[in-house]
Design a protein with these regions (language model features):
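Short, histidine-centered active-site or binding-site loop motifs used for metal coordination
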Residues: 1-3, 36-38, 140-141, 196
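N-terminal Rossmann-like or analogous alpha/beta NTP/dinucleotide-binding catalytic cores
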Residues: 3-131
Length: 249
């Protein structure tokens, strides 16, 4: 995860829940990356923010059940080999292919206030860096949210091209989807995000969570308390369904 702020429940259902499950199965040798170098691609003017949040992200991992005795947590900038691989992989990917990546296209559109009409090479090329992160440790299974699938596919393309030139050196990774889908924000937006201001953070206090849930979007057609509401457009009902057992919902 990128240390640009505290992690939220979208991160939990998107990948952390699956990571904890795989860790506790005893069948895998898990590695978790704190991607501080990647975080600088759109926070280049605020390195202190990235440095500070490395610790915050690590604490969020621990609070969710990531066990350092079973899982290796590492910081991207402390593994120089990934930077080396990124340079090699950059020769295998065209600018046009990076621009077609759906995840990258969406994120660039969301960051117009940072980049304007001209995105930096560093940000456009972060899928190449991500491929290096995965293959440095011969990653076979990568827990991701649904919106991250195009990044894994691009990594697989890089691996195939590299192997076609240099022989079967790299492992082609597989995405492991969490059981949950992309988590909606408090405002009803299809994605919860730090930059969107619609997130419930894993480290929020009980009072903060209560305040946020009380302000969440509900059915606008439910005017009176005893009116029947539509749970499909009520974020309170949506979160209740996420966290409660079936018989409680």
């Amino acid at each position: 995860d990128r240390p640009t702020g505290r992690l939220h429940i979208g991160h939990y259902f998107g990948s952390i829940q699956k990571r904890v499950e795989m860790q506790n199965s005893g069948l895998y040798d898990p590695y978790i990356l704190i991607a501080d170098v990647q975080a600088l691609t759109d926070n280049f003017n605020n390195p202190e923010k990235v440095r500070k949040n490395v610790r915050e992200v690590a604490m969020d991992y621990l609070s969710c059940g990531i066990d350092p005795e079973k899982t290796t947590i590492y910081i991207q900038s402390m593994i120089p080999e990934t930077a080396e691989l990124t340079v090699f992989y950059s020769n295998l990917v065209t600018i046009a292919r990076l621009e077609r990546n759906p995840t990258v296209k969406t994120e660039i559109a969301q960051k117009r206030d940072i980049f304007g009409e001209s995105v930096t090479y560093g940000f456009l090329g972060y899928p190449v860096s991500q491929a290096a992160d995965i293959t440095t440790f011969s990653g076979e299974l990568v827990p991701v949210g649904e919106d991250q699938l195009p990044l894994i596919e691009q990594c697989r393309e890089i691996v195939r091209k590299f192997n076609s030139i240099y022989g079967d050196v790299l492992i082609e990774p597989q995405a492991v989807l969490s059981s949950g889908k992309r988590i909606k924000g408090l405002d009803g937006n299809e994605k919860m995000g730090k930059s969107l201001g619609n997130a419930i953070y894993l480290s929020d206090s009980e009072e903060e969570i209560t305040k946020k849930v009380m302000s969440a979007v509900t059915d606008p057609n439910r005017i009176r308390k005893d009116d029947l509401g539509n749970p499909d457009v009520c974020m309170v009902a949506y979160y209740h369904n996420l966290f409660s057992k079936k018989e409680e919902y």
